[in-house]
C-alpha cells in the first residue's frame, strides 16, 4: 500500500470517529478529508456552533485532535500525525 493510500485511509478512520463524536454531542458539521504533505488533514465546518469545539486558544480542538489520533492509532496500529481543523480555526491563523 502506498504512503498516499495509508494517509487517505487514516483520514477515513478519523472521519468515521469524528462523525460518531459529533453525533454523541449532537453537533452538525461537514467533514472534509485531504492529504497535505506527509499527513492526513481533516476539517469540520458547519457554522458558528462549532466554535465551542475550538475552545479558548484552540485548547478543545487540540484535545479532540489527540483523541482522534488515538482512535486512528487503535484501528491502524500506527502512530498518527493527523491534523484536525474545526471551523477553519487553524486555517485562519496561518
Question: Model segments located where?
Answer:
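RNA-contacting regions in translation and RNA-metabolism proteins
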Residues: 1-94
Amino acid at each position: 500500500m502506498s504512503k498516499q493510500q495509508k494517509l487517505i485511509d487514516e483520514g477515513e478512520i478519523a472521519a468515521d470517529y469524528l462523525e460518531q463524536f459529533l453525533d454523541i454531542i449532537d453537533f452538525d458539521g461537514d467533514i472534509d478529508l485531504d492529504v497535505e504533505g506527509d499527513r492526513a488533514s481533516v476539517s469540520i465546518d458547519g457554522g458558528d456552533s462549532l466554535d465551542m469545539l475550538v475552545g479558548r486558544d484552540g485548547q478543545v480542538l487540540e484535545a479532540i485532535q489527540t483523541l482522534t489520533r488515538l482512535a486512528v492509532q487503535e484501528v491502524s496500529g500506527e502512530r498518527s500525525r493527523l491534523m484536525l481543523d474545526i471551523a477553519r480555526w487553524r486555517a485562519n491563523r496561518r
